[in-house]
Amino acid sequence: MTAATLVTLALSLSLAQHDAAPAPAPAAVEQHGAAPEAAASADPHAAPAGEHGAAVEAHAAAAGEHGEAAGHEGGHDESLGAVMLHHVTDGYVIEHPGFCNGAFAWNCEWDLRATFGDALKFGKLDLTPTKHVIMMWLASALLLVVVLAAVRKKSLVPRGLYNFIELLVAFVRNEIAVKNIGEKDADRFTPYLVTAFFFILFLNLFGLLPFSATATANLSVTVAMALFTFFITQYAAIRAMGMGGYVAHLTGGVPKSLAPLWLIMVPVEFLGLFTKPFALTVRLFANMLAGHFVILALLGLIFALGTPWVAFGSVPMALSIFLLELFVAFVQAYIFTMLSSLFIGAGLVHHGDDHGHAEEHGHAGPGMGSEHGSHVAGASPGHG
């Protein structure tokens, strides 16, 4: 029961009591000897009752308007919060401009569930794509188009957009992969790093376009991408060190003579394996989500305060944050790619470290300490 209904009932009861109070009025008329008037006393009192009924309706209408106004004002902040959440959360409806209901509108809706129906439902497993999945499909398609067009270019000297794309590819290879992984192994992991860089970049840029969505503000998307880096990192480490060396690395380099410390080092090293993908996940997700919330909050000041004059301050501020988000789109793609290359390179570097530890601690016989020490010292630059 709404507040407007309660107010209407209260007014009706009070007015009903007020109607019952002036009952002696006909007797007063009869005492004055106005018989003809007494005969017609029902009609004059019917008119006040009608007036009271009109008053009740007026009060009810006023109460209803008051309730609606209060509900509108109370739900204004909720509607602003709902708009903000709707902008960043995933769903099955994509808004777009177009012709719907026989006329052009800016808020036409594409219901993905209605489009795909039950074609992608397998029991309790629902594979119907959401709007973030659609954005990832578009980013993948754009990535294929750009790469294939750049590969098939006829001119040896790239121009325009292809020059910019080639510049970014060379930057990822030379400044990220080579410096963090090494010249020897960089080319093996450059394709993944380039793909991750452009995929994240396109998703970030799509989120700045009207009627689109920011898939990188979805925790599930960033978790999946961080897991790709995690599995590639573990694969690189196992391939470089072997399974035995990989497991031995979990001891943190503590020698067998201090084996009791393994009870501390092994859990710490094991947890350290998962802190890296966690950092990748939260960093990308939080940065992209926060930027959109700030823009929407600044624009929402116009509606929250109820005056258009706020637009002179909030719109320029929102535009400034938008330009900053354009820069952040490139920065977050770079940071994710750089951290991924650092983690991969760390797994490869551990191979040289463990090899040095094995030579120092595992195979030196009695009387060979000084000779072996000089051998390791002389070989260490080669390992670097």
UniProtKB/Swiss-Prot annotation:
PROSITE patterns noted in UniProt? ATPASE_A
| Major localization listed first in the record, in broad terms | membrane
> Where does the UniProt annotation locate this protein?
Cell inner membrane
Could you tell me where the Low complexity compositional bias lies? 23-64
Keywords linked to the UniProt accession = ATP synthesis, Cell inner membrane, Cell membrane, CF(0), Hydrogen ion transport, Ion transport, Membrane, Transmembrane, Transmembrane helix, Transport
Q: How does it sit in the membrane?
A: Multi-pass membrane protein
Q: Spans of biased composition, class Basic and acidic residues?
A: 65-76
SUPFAM superfamilies registered for this protein in UniProt: F1F0 ATP synthase subunit A (SSF81336)
Q: List where the protein spans the membrane.
A: 131-151, 193-213, 218-238, 258-278, 293-313, 319-339
Q: Which Gene3D superfamilies match?
A: ATP synthase, F0 complex, subunit A
Which GO molecular-function terms appear in the entry? proton-transporting ATP synthase activity, rotational mechanism
Any one GO CC term of this protein is: plasma membrane
Q: Which domain of life is it from?
A: Bacteria
Renumbered residue ranges of the record's region Disordered: 23-76, 355-384
Q: Which PANTHER family does this chain map to?
A: ATP SYNTHASE SUBUNIT A
Family, as annotated: Belongs to the ATPase A chain family.
Q: What does this protein do?
A: Key component of the proton channel; it plays a direct role in the translocation of protons across the membrane.
User: What is said about its interaction partners and assembly?
Assistant: F-type ATPases have 2 components, CF(1) - the catalytic core - and CF(0) - the membrane proton channel. CF(1) has five subunits: alpha(3), beta(3), gamma(1), delta(1), epsilon(1). CF(0) has three main subunits: a(1), b(2) and c(9-12). The alpha and beta chains form an alternating ring which encloses part of the gamma chain. CF(1) is attached to CF(0) by a central stalk formed by the gamma and epsilon chains, while a peripheral stalk is formed by the delta and b chains.
**What HAMAP family does the record tag this protein with?**
ATP_synth_a_bact
- Name the UniProt record assigns to this protein: ATP synthase subunit a
Instruction: Identify the species of origin.
Output: Anaeromyxobacter sp. (strain K)
Which lineage?
Bacteria, Pseudomonadati, Myxococcota, Myxococcia, Myxococcales
